[in-house]
């Protein structure tokens, strides 16, 4: 008999804990959690497609997906890849599920999908639509799984050790796919590059202000402040620490702002010959004017605005999300975020209680990734020829 899973009627350990809340799960349901080989390539390179839920026709054939359904996609992929497939919900069900329920089911199946990645060890993972994106990233970000937010990125996922490409929902052309949607899917599949080496992003962190004596005319820096609140207008606020990454260096610097280094820092900020980048520059500009009595000269780029220009979907422009989709690193603010939060925009936070080493390392990473993001955004935006990014 096919019935919904009732956690009270099943012994502990019989199923994964997430099965209890999965709208697609039934005791005795057929599971398709083993990666399914759909195409053998001409080399050792591998690719895993995470698709939608299992269709009735595929299930009747004993497979998670029909080969002809994937054919248009396979024809667009380089022939060197051996291609595997797994549905974002690994249990088959005939129940009518809303889109929201499908996403919940995919979140519940997240560990199955991650296990499949570990088993296949692919060079690339393709995530078709929001449920597949949720399966991988739901527990790693608070930005949701809207495909419009994620598509267009080739994520060098440092946790999974492979490139991840989120895409729109896959509907074959003969199913009546919207021309623009199919065009964007085709464009995004060009991000699968067999010749691209998987990158790592490492930097030395120096928690001194030595960089202040090294900067000269012609340098380009990304910089960031850690402050006692969001806005500087109320009394009692100060710039607690600053971080600087000079483009091309192997070291990012992060240091407490003190009377001893304040004048040199102000000289650098006011210099038009030292070019400057920040993420949401209005924050650094506002705090500089309020605390130092000067404006910042030499601005050349705001990576927050750059992110908006590349993808204006709500939720895209935050630095931590940009770091995830561009450099594959999960949010590194966990150890400090409780100290940086204030109850109101004018309130004072608890930054003074934050462990200094953790705070300075956090700031260094912010400036480093901001610098890398500038280089990538400049390359992307310089190559654009039309309004949809093609």
What annotation goes with each model-predicted range?
Residues 47-49, 56-72, 195-325:
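Conserved RNase H-like, two-metal-ion catalytic cores of nucleic-acid enzymes
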Residues 197-199, 294-297, 337-390:
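Mixed-charge, glycine-rich, non-catalytic linkers/tails in nucleic-acid processing enzymes
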Residues 88-90, 302, 366, 370:
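Catalytic palm active-site di-aspartate
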Residues 74, 117, 189, 269, ...:
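Hydrophobic residues within well-ordered, non-membrane alpha-helices that form the packing/core
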Residues 189, 278-281, 285, 316, ...:
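Hydrophobic faces of stable alpha-helices that mediate helix-helix packing
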Residues 328-337:
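Proline-centered turn/helix-capping motifs that create local helix->coil transitions or kinks
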Residues 1-194:
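A polyanion-binding, active-site-adjacent surface
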């Amino acid at each position: 008999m096919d019935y919904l899973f009732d956690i009270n009627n099943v012994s502990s350990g019989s199923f994964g804990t997430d099965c209890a809340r999965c709208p697609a799960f039934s005791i005795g349901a057929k599971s398709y959690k083993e990666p399914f080989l759909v195409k053998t390539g001409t080399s050792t390179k591998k690719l895993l497609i995470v698709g939608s839920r299992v269709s009735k026709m595929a299930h009747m054939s004993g497979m998670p997906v029909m080969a002809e359904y994937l054919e248009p996609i396979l024809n667009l992929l380089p022939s060197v890849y051996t291609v595997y497939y797994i549905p974002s919900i690994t249990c088959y069900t005939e129940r009518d599920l809303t889109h929201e329920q499908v996403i919940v089911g995919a979140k519940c199946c997240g560990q199955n999908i991650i296990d499949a990645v570990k088993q296949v060890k692919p060079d690339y993972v393709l995530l078709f639509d929001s449920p597949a994106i949720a399966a991988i990233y739901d527990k790693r970000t608070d930005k949701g799984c809207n495909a419009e937010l994620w598509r267009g990125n080739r994520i060098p996922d440092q946790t999974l050790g492979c490139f991840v490409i989120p895409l729109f929902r896959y509907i074959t052309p003969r199913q009546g796919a919207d021309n623009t949607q199919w065009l964007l899917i085709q464009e995004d599949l060009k991000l699968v590059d067999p010749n691209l080496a998987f990158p790592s992003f490492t930097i030395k962190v120096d928690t001194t202000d030595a960089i202040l004596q090294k900067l000269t005319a012609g340098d380009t820096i990304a910089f960031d402040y850690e402050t006692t609140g969001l806005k500087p207008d109320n009394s009692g606020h100060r710039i607690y620490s600053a971080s600087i990454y000079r483009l091309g260096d192997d070291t990012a610097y992060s240091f407490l702002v003190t009377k001893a280094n304040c004048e040199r820092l102000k000289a650098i900020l006011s210099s038009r010959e030292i070019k400057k980048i920040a993420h949401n520059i209005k924050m650094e500009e506002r705090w500089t004017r309020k605390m130092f009595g000067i404006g910042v000269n030499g601005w050349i780029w705001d990576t927050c605005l750059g992110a908006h220009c590349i993808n204006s979907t709500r939720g895209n422009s935050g630095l931590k999300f940009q770091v995830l989709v561009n450099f594959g690193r999960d949010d590194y603010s966990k150890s400090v975020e409780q100290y940086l939060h204030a109850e109101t925009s004018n309130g004072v936070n608890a930054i003074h209680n934050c462990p200094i080493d953790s705070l300075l390392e956090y700031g260094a990473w912010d400036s480093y990734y901001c610098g890398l993001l500038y280089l990538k955004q400049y390359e992307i935006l310089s190559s654009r020829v039309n309004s949809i990014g093609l």
